[in-house]
């Protein structure tokens, strides 16, 4: 079976494990993009530690959950955003102002929309979490 969107699959796995009350989950396959998104989620406090485990194939991430995620998901298509248009996308994907975060890929790497707004750089939307 072909996996069309590994990021969406990873976020769905995390959301489902969070919903049934698990303390950890396994995300496969691993990629740099998924690792960068997990790092941003960890910095924002939505997940605990995560580690890469080499299984001889693509690898897996073992993620420790802390029970703070209500919903998370990938944003498709990957919309391009500028610094002035973050608020429009926050209204579309997040339930309230200053609640949750958009995860953005920029020329300076993957970061939250708060960090991108502070650095005054735009990019493409990858995911949302709240």
UniProtKB/Swiss-Prot annotation:
Record carries keyword Iron: no
Database matches in Pfam families: Ribosomal_S8
Signal sequence range: none
GO molecular function annotations of the record: rRNA binding; structural constituent of ribosome
Any one of the GO BP annotations: translation
InterPro entries found in the cross-reference section: Ribosomal_uS8 (IPR000630), Ribosomal_uS8_CS (IPR047863), Ribosomal_uS8_sf (IPR035987)
GO cellular component: cytosolic small ribosomal subunit
Keywords, comma-separated and alphabetical: Ribonucleoprotein, Ribosomal protein, RNA-binding, rRNA-binding
Assembly notes: Part of the 30S ribosomal subunit.
Functional note: One of the primary rRNA binding proteins, it binds directly to 16S rRNA central domain where it helps coordinate assembly of the platform of the 30S subunit.
Family, similarity comment: Belongs to the universal ribosomal protein uS8 family.
Protein name per UniProt: Small ribosomal subunit protein uS8
Source organism of this protein record: Methanosarcina acetivorans (strain ATCC 35395 / DSM 2834 / JCM 12185 / C2A)
């Amino acid at each position: 079976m072909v996996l069309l969107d590994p990021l969406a699959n990873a976020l769905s796995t995390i959301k489902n494990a969070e919903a049934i009350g698990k303390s950890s989950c396994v995300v496969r396959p691993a990629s740099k993009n998924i690792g960068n998104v997990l790092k941003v989620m960890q910095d924002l406090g939505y997940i605990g530690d995560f580690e890469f485990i080499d299984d001889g194939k693509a690898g897996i991430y073992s993620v420790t959950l802390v029970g703070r995620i209500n919903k998370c998901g990938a944003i498709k298509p990957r919309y391009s955003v500028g610094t002035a248009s973050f608020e429009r996308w926050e209204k579309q994907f997040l339930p309230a102002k200053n609640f949750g975060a958009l995860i953005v890929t920029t020329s300076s790497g993957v970061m939250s929309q708060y960090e991108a707004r502070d650095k005054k750089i735009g990019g493409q939307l990858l995911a949302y979490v709240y």
